[in-house]
Amino acid sequence: MKMKKLNIYIIGLLTLMLCGIQSCALESEVFDEITPSIYPQTERDVRDLVTGNAYSPFQNYDYGGLYNVANGVMLISDMATEYGFCSWGGWIWEPLEFARWTPSDEDRIAYPWTNYLKGISKMTLTIDRITNVNMNKDLLNQYIAELRCARGFLAFLLYDLYGPIIVADLETLKNAEDEIILPRLSEEETHNFIVTEPVSYTHLRAH
């Protein structure tokens, strides 16, 4: 009789445990990536995100950055117009000095385009991601204006070297897996983008 009661007790206990396990909703936590749902959340997050995406292209670090000494925008512009030359000798800079570049020289000639055109898209996504963060609205508007000004200035630098640029809209950027090939803007569209983007920043500074 005692064994029977013990068996019933054990079976009942196991049943309760199994019910508890089945009713437990497991939610996974992602630790290896940062998504818009978890970042940015605070004013500090926004500041860091804006600093990283609005200002990082305009720097010089060794052979990186738009203003680097080896193949930045200033060096390419100066050498292509005979205003400057490279004291290191011909080598990869010779095509610029003598306007004799070929497809094989693309890596150096197109460095700002291939490495920093995407910066415009990063700034567009950053504007979208910070817009609804709960923070001081005046400061938020300032950050958005800084991003737009940076977009306009980056577009100007690239247009000066390569002509009309490619600007992806937000919907395309949010559906990057569709792999849509975008055309360049027209001359007029590029001009308008360059002129109107910094306006928000200058207007904010004036007030």
Can you say where each PLM-predicted feature lies in the sequence?
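Bacterial Sec-dependent N-terminal signal peptides
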Residues: 1-32
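Short acidic-aromatic linear motifs embedded in glycine-rich loops, typified by GG[WY][YF]DAGD(H)
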Residues: 24-146, 150-192
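Acidic, proline/serine/threonine- and glycine-rich low-complexity intrinsically disordered segments
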Residues: 198-199
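Conserved small/polar residues in nucleotide/adenosyl-binding loops
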Residues: 202-207
